[in-house]
């Protein structure tokens, strides 16, 4: 099961639907409705911290969950605000960048982590005004925009990954494949029909398939910082 922390953002539900389309079981909880300890006790195989319209310091359990996943060695994906929370936890600076709401950018990457098997560059949709700078050595930058803005990183030794852009946006290329690679990192195997459909943009070591749920209606929400 993937536990998704919803930072009160409508994009959360796009992520949920993508994960379910890939065969994952998903539980969603608001950022002020659970503690990090409760999250770890939920039985989740992996965690996802969603986008949101605030800073990491205002994002409820998000920073505490990053710390808990680090201590427990649990797989974690942070998207936009979640990416910033991971960066801040490890000592990166979260600061103002250019306003990138609804803009697409080419993303260049090193073919590791979430980007295994994907072409470089690919187009990604960005909804943010904050970025992570001064990324510490514990985080390996593995994706950048053409102006060298950090678009993604992975922890050097832990299964922790962050993306500044939105893989769940319809205008982002290979979004399902990136999330499939995260599920593979978390040990969740895709059904063979999905693995074949994703083709080259899928990591080779996907783990065991999980059941799907009917789509969930999105709550009112904002856009990522």
Residue ranges and their predicted role:
Residues 111-158:
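Catalytic beta-strand/loop cores that center a nucleophilic Ser/Cys/Thr
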Residues 121, 157, 162-173:
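Phosphate-binding/catalytic loops
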Residues 1, 75-77, 93, 140, ...:
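Proline-centered loop/turn at the N-terminus of a beta-strand
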Residues 19-20, 69:
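Hydrophobic alpha-helical packing residues
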Residues 195-197, 218-223:
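Glycine-biased, low-complexity coil/linker segments
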Residues 41-116, 123, 179:
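Cysteine-nucleophile active-site neighborhood
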Residues 1-10, 168-195, 202-210, 225:
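RNA-binding accessory domains that recognize and position tRNA/RNA substrates
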Residues 3, 22, 28-30, 35, ...:
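A generic "structured core" feature
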């Amino acid at each position: 099961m993937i536990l998704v922390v919803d930072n009160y953002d409508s994009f959360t539900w796009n992520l949920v639907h993508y994960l379910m389309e890939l065969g994952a079981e998903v539980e969603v909880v608001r950022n002020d409705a659970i503690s990090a300890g409760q999250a770890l006790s939920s039985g989740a195989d992996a965690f996802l911290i969603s986008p949101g319209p605030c800073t990491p310091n205002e994002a409820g359990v998000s920073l505490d969950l990053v710390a808990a996943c680090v201590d427990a060695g649990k797989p974690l994906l942070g998207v936009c605000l979640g990416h910033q929370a991971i960066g801040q936890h490890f000592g990166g600076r979260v600061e103002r960048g250019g306003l990138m709401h609804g803009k697409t950018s080419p993303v260049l990457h090193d073919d590791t982590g979430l980007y295994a098997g994907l072409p470089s560059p690919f187009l990604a949709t960005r909804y943010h005004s904050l970025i992570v700078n001064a990324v510490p050595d514990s985080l390996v930058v593995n994706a950048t925009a053409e102006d060298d803005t950090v678009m993604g990183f992975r922890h050097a030794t832990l299964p922790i990954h962050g993306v500044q852009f939105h893989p769940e946006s319809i205008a982002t290329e290979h979004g399902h494949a990136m999330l499939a690679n995260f599920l593979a990192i978390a040990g969740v195997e895709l059904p063979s029909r999905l693995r074949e459909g994703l083709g080259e943009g899928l990591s080779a070591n996907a783990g065991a398939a999980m059941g799907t749920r009917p789509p969930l209606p999105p709550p009112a929400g904002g856009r990522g910082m």
